[in-house]
Amino acid sequence: MSLKVDIQKSFGDFRLDVAFEAGNETLALLGASGCGKTMTLKMIAGVEKPDAGVIELDGVTLFDSEKKINLTPQQRHVGLMFQNYALFENMTVYRNILMGVREDRRSAGAKEEVEAVMDCLHITELADRHPSQISGGQQQRVALARIMVSHPNILMLDEPFSALDEHLRFKLETVVQDAIEDFGKTVLWVSHNRDEVYRRADRMAILDDGHLDAIGTVDEVFRDPRTPKAAALTGCKNILPAECVDETHLRLSDHDIVLAVKPYPGALQQAGETAVQLKPAAISHVGIRMHHIRPVTDMSDPNQLLCIVTGETRNPFSYVLDLAPAASADRPFAMMEIEKDLWEKTRSEELLITIDPADILLLRDK
């Protein structure tokens, strides 16, 4: 299966304009609330209508504004699981799932098909219960089972774990992942959780304010998120204004600190265009992940900087330190994550840190 999307829609001052393709893979759409993720899924499903553009699925045109094509949701055979699961409270779990079987397939084999999907998702024992009698995680699996028995041409999950606690979320991710692998077609997975995306997606696209900032494999996007907002969505806590000194050095504008950096690779495809080499002058910010700031262990380490520790936050297995340059201690610089045992053994007011040039994210404004 293959999905091609190039659509636009305006809502007052907000404009959604996205273009991407997906094959037999899990493509995650990562973005903050209100960026257009859910609306994108709704337009693919036919629940909402784009103002303009084209949507194709496996060579079939689902929507084309110029050709006046707009298939109904039923004609599109798309599986969309909403955040609230939308189960029928007056029906048992079994009946809820049976409702997903298309009318032209409701034959003698429908019962066996429903039972097989229930077994796959480990909900067989819930068959005679009603949605109000089962947990949120169980409701989620029922909703997914109802979609799977409809044999959709594409599966779209809208933040499927957002209402679940961390322990249950991780457990159910594995169950859903097994179902996705059995599905074997295109899956769109909307999320604002970067860890969830990293664990489960093959590729990811970062959506910000209605536009795609970057799209690529999960490792590519985390390694080179391209823009400050995209870097923040991948979990980067230190994003600092910077200006070019030369092709391998940048100055942090707020601190007058010069850092050695790697040449910009320009490795990712940006929405709708082929990536090109980014000139150093286009770089507006740098991103430094907390765990990439380390204590100096060798005086030959690059990008050394003496810092004052202005605060610390204890986590179960680490500390997050607030750092400021010793030369300007009143101006916060960055946050650093350090192993709990190491910091408790070496805690001090000053810390000499190092940052590998290869770990510095080179970012640009849109």
Locations of the language-model features?
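Non-catalytic connector elements of ABC transporters
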Residues: 5-26, 32, 38-39, 49, ...
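C-terminal boundary and immediately downstream tail of ABC-type ATPase nucleotide-binding domains
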Residues: 223-249, 287
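A position-specific signal in ABC ATPase nucleotide-binding domains
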Residues: 48-49, 56, 102
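ABC ATPase NBD Q-loop/coupling interface
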Residues: 54-76
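ABC ATPase nucleotide-binding domain helices that frame the ATP-binding cleft
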Residues: 38-41, 142
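ABC ATPase nucleotide-binding domains
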Residues: 77-79, 87, 92-229
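Helix-to-loop junction immediately C-terminal to a conserved catalytic motif
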Residues: 45
